From Swiss-Prot:
Pfam families in the cross-refs: GreA_GreB (PF01272), GreA_GreB_N (PF03449)
GO-annotated molecular function: DNA binding; RNA polymerase binding
UniProt key word Transcription: yes
Similarity field: Belongs to the GreA/GreB family.
Gene Ontology BP annotations: DNA-templated transcription elongation; regulation of DNA-templated transcription elongation
Keyword annotations of the record: Coiled coil, DNA-binding, Transcription, Transcription regulation
Protein name, entry field: Transcription elongation factor GreA
Parts forming coiled coils: 1-72
Species annotation: Streptococcus gordonii (strain Challis / ATCC 35105 / BCRC 15272 / CH1 / DL1 / V288)
Gene3D superfamilies according to UniProt: Transcription elongation factor, GreA/GreB, C-terminal domain, Transcription elongation factor, GreA/GreB, N-terminal domain
Cited HAMAP family: GreA_GreB (MF_00105)
Protein role: Necessary for efficient RNA polymerase transcription elongation past template-encoded arresting sites. The arresting sites in DNA have the property of trapping a certain fraction of elongating RNA polymerases that pass through, resulting in locked ternary complexes. Cleavage of the nascent transcript by cleavage factors such as GreA or GreB allows the resumption of elongation from the new 3'terminus. GreA releases sequences of 2 to 3 nucleotides.
Domain of life: Bacteria
């Protein structure tokens, strides 16, 4: 079975590579040192510091594994290859819910780069799926678990 690919921009991949380096060169050694110190306290059966450090080690190793997979199977998307006025990964899109006045701006990214607080939505999210391939002036229907709503695409531009 073929591995899943992770569409992303080159900048997203570079960000993941930096995160991976930080985990391997800083966080992993810190956790190993905490485990070593906690072991020195003696009886491991009731050693909460040891348990906490082992839990953190498992978390860090899981993050490392996840990032390595995403980087290994990264599919670099060139936003220039997508039509200038078409929504795709690496594009910034301004939308407005039909019947509302407030405008919203989103950057479309691969799933690895999603960050709702920074306005970066995954191409796999409900809003990302609704917008991909659409153009300025189009109406897109966003399907969510609690219902659907329509948005009008006001502007599409390459993310700076």
């Amino acid at each position: 079975m073929a591995e899943k690919t992770y569409p992303m921009t080159l900048a997203e991949k570079e960000k993941l590579e930096k995160e991976l380096e930080e985990l391997k060169l800083v966080r992993r050694p810190e956790v190993v040192e905490r485990i070593k110190i906690a072991r020195s306290y003696g009886d491991l059966s009731e050693n909460s510091e040891y348990e906490a450090a082992k839990d953190e080690q498992a978390f860090v190793e899981g993050q490392i594994s996840s990032l390595e997979t995403k980087i290994r199977y990264a599919e670099i998307v060139d936003s220039d290859a997508v039509a200038k006025d078409e929504v795709g990964i690496g594009k910034t899109v301004t939308i407005q819910e039909v019947g509302e006045t407030e405008k919203e701006v989103y950057i479309i990214v691969g799933s690895a780069g999603a960050d709702a607080f920074a306005g970066k939505v995954s191409n796999e999210s409900p809003i990302g799926q609704a917008l991909i391939g659409k153009k300025k002036g189009d109406i897109a229907t966003v399907e969510t678990p609690v219902g659907s709503y329509d948005v009008k695409i006001l502007k599409v531009e390459k993310t700076k």
